[in-house]
Amino acid sequence: MSNIRFYRCESCGIIAYAFGEQPLPGLKELVPNTVDASGEKHLPVVNVEGDKVTVRVGSVEHPMLPEHWIQWVLVETDKGFHRHNLNPAEAPEAVFTLPGEKVIAVYEYCNLHGLWKTSL
């Protein structure tokens, strides 16, 4: 399993990923599942059927409004990473076709409630 870490620039809001133990100076590290918010609306729900991976954000559907939405879903596999960007008014879900890859974890980023992760 990798040691991907996520960071956010407090001034511009950009999200960066890093690998390894060296922190990214000037950026705030995001720790998954630590924001006081509704887990049932934020934890990724993952369904794997063969090489098709379906991710729905929350067991209760997350809102997708311009002021509160899921910006992206990222799937970590034994071979790398796959990201799907979302927009307000879209369903908070993503489908990935990953032949020959095993899903390790799924992350999502909410513009208000931060980073969330489900490990498989």
Cite the ranges covered by each PLM segment.
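Short acidic/polar inter-strand loop motif in beta-rich domains
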Residues: 111-119
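Short, aromatic- and glycine-rich surface loops/edge beta-strands on solvent-exposed regions
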Residues: 102-112
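Short cysteine-rich clusters marking metal-coordination/redox-active sites
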Residues: 9-12, 22-26, 110
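Transition segment at domain starts
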Residues: 16-52
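Short amphipathic, basic-aromatic surface patches that mediate peripheral association
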Residues: 57-65
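Short strand-edge motifs at loop-to-beta-strand transitions and within beta-strands
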Residues: 92-96
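Short metal-coordination and nucleic-acid-contact micro-motifs, chiefly zinc-binding Cys/His arrays
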Residues: 2-8, 19-22, 106
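Extended low-complexity, serine/threonine- and proline-enriched intrinsically disordered segments
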Residues: 69-79
